[in-house]
Regions:
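Extreme N-terminal basic, low-complexity initiation segments
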Residues: 1-12, 16-17
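Terminal "cap-and-tail" regions of soluble proteins that handle hydrophobic small molecules
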Residues: 42-59, 166-248
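Short, aromatic-enriched amphipathic alpha-helices that serve as compact interaction elements
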Residues: 54-70
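Exposed beta-sheet edge and beta->alpha loop/turn motif
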Residues: 128-164, 178-198
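Short hydrophobic alpha-helical segments enriched in small aliphatic residues
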Residues: 17-19, 35, 40
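A solvent-exposed, acidic/Ser-Thr-rich amphipathic alpha-helical stretch
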Residues: 74-140
Length: 248
C-alpha cells in the first residue's frame, strides 16, 4: 500500500471517530434533556392528579345529590351538604335541613321530582370550588285535572367547600333555561290559565305553573339563561372562588 492510500485510510478513520463522538455526545445530551423533561412531567402529573381527584370527588357529590334525593334516601342525602348548606329552587329557598324535610314530606305525599345530569364544568381554587352541571328537572303533576310531565332544562350552579378530605355543598342555585309541559295521555289537553302562565319567567314558566297549581309558592326572580340575575350569580361565584364571603 502506498503512502497516499495509507494517508487516506487514516483520514477516514479520524473522520469516522469524530462523527461517532459527535453522535454519542448528541445522544447523551438528548438523554439528559429527556430525563429533565420526564422529571418535570412527573411533577406536573402529580399536580394534575390532585386537581383531577378534587374534580372527581366533587362530581361524585353532584351525582349522589340526584341519586339520593330522587330515591328518597334522606340520611345519605344529608351527607352531600355542609351543616350550613342552603338550597334555592322555584318552590323552596332555605337551609339544607329544611329542604330535606320539605322534600321528604312531598315524597311521602306522592310528589315526584326527578333529576337527570349532563356534563360538569368544575373550577377549583384551594378549598373552594364552583361546579356547573347541565341537568333536567322532570316533575309529574296534575295540571288543571290532567296528569302532565313538566321538563325543565338548565344547570346546577354549586358553591363547594372542602373541609378535611370532604367536598360538600354550601349552596345550590339552579339556572333555569327552558321548559315544556306534556300531557301523559296525548289525547288529554289541559286548559291552561293563560294569564297566570304568562306571569312566570320564560325559563321555568310551565314548571312554575304546574307547581303553583299544586299549592307551591313560586320565586319569580330565579336565574335564567341570560339576564341580570344570572350575571349576579356569576359575579358571586367569582367572588367565592377568590376567597370572598358567600353573598347569597
Amino acid at each position: 500500500m502506498g503512502r497516499a492510500e495509507e494517508g487516506g485510510d487514516r483520514l477516514r478513520t479520524l473522520l469516522y471517530a469524530h462523527a461517532t463522538a459527535r453522535t454519542s455526545t448528541a445522544m447523551l445530551a438528548a438523554g439528559v434533556n429527556f430525563a429533565i423533561a420526564a422529571h418535570g412531567m412527573e411533577k406536573d402529573t402529580g399536580t394534575m392528579d390532585a386537581s383531577l381527584l378534587d374534580r372527581l370527588r366533587i362530581r361524585e357529590v353532584i351525582e349522589n345529590w340526584a341519586r339520593w334525593r330522587d330515591a328518597g334516601d334522606w340520611e345519605r342525602f344529608r351527607t352531600v351538604w355542609h351543616a350550613e348548606g342552603r338550597m334555592m329552587a322555584t318552590w323552596f329557598q332555605g337551609s339544607a335541613d329544611a329542604f330535606i324535610a320539605a322534600s321528604r314530606a312531598g315524597f311521602e305525599r306522592g310528589v315526584r321530582i326527578l333529576h337527570f345530569l349532563g356534563g360538569s364544568a368544575i373550577d377549583v381554587s384551594g378549598a373552594r370550588a364552583l361546579a356547573q352541571t347541565k341537568m333536567t328537572i322532570s316533575q309529574r303533576a296534575d295540571v288543571d285535572g290532567v296528569p302532565c310531565d313538566v321538563v325543565c332544562t338548565g344547570r346546577f350552579y354549586d358553591f363547594f367547600e372542602q373541609r378535611g378530605d370532604a367536598w360538600r355543598i354550601m349552596l345550590r342555585q339552579p339556572i333555569y333555561e327552558k321548559d315544556r309541559l306534556d300531557p301523559v295521555d296525548p289525547a288529554a289537553v289541559p286548559q291552561l290559565d293563560r294569564p297566570l302562565l304568562a306571569q312566570f319567567p320564560e325559563g321555568y314558566r310551565h314548571l312554575a305553573y304546574a307547581q303553583a297549581r299544586n299549592g307551591f309558592a313560586i320565586k319569580r326572580d330565579m336565574p335564567q339563561l341570560t339576564g341580570s340575575e344570572v350575571e349576579r350569580l356569576y359575579a358571586d361565584g367569582a367572588a367565592w372562588l377568590a376567597g370572598g364571603p358567600l353573598a347569597r
